[in-house]
Amino acid sequence: MARGLLVVFEGPEGAGKSTQLRLLADWLGARGRDVVAVREPGGTIIGDEIRRILLDPNADIVPRSEALLFMASRAQLVEREIRPALESGATVLLDRFFLSTYAYQGVGRGIPEADLRAANTIATQGLVPDLTLLLTMPVAAGLARAIDRGERDRMERADLEFHERVARAFEAFATREWQEGHPECGPIVLVDANGTQPAVFDRVLGTLHTRWPGTFPGL
């Protein structure tokens, strides 16, 4: 059986990645594709407990602990959910992965890239995404969306300067030079997240068609 595809959705707060992931999961499922949709942190019993700790607005977590908690959730998710699904031939849609670690804990929190890289090697055991869809939009607009969703979690409550650093980092990650120096992240494509959900979803589908013409039914 052919290995499945791992497609990651990334982006700053409020960019709509989780919404677009759900839309794609539904779209592929309706066309007979075996789809597994998971998120970071979370996706397993242990991962969900880690997620609760990480996003608790009252939790006092130092940057190194934050990074290692994300890695622990990732290791569990890769071993228990992602690899088995890929080996069964399923398309795995993942809400955040190592790119978020580089952006939030690396550029945002100031943890050295070499340290994050070493920890990620342990967590993923060399698993590389087949494609990362990086949704982009202005920071202020994204944070406004996050606020409209209701009470903000610990990550969303970080100051504007932090979120601006993260957003700039994400955009830098899409450059060819950065990707060539970070093969563990796989190919990264920017997707404009401005506009209506259907308009953004059309861009997502267009990106998949360009990357894998004929692979997905209905594209």
Regions inferred by a protein language model and the residue ranges of each:
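Walker A (P-loop) phosphate-binding loop of P-loop NTPases
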Residues: 14
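Hydrophobic positions on the alpha1 helix immediately C-terminal to the Walker A/P-loop
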Residues: 20
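ATP-dependent small-molecule kinase phosphotransfer cores
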Residues: 27-124, 201-203
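A glycine- and Lys/Arg-enriched "phosphate-lid" helix/loop adjacent to the NTP-binding pocket
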Residues: 101-168
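NTP-dependent small-molecule kinase module
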Residues: 25, 140-219
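Pre-Walker A (Motif I) flank of P-loop NTPase domains
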Residues: 2-6
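Hydrophobic anchor at the beta1->P-loop junction of P-loop NTPases
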Residues: 9
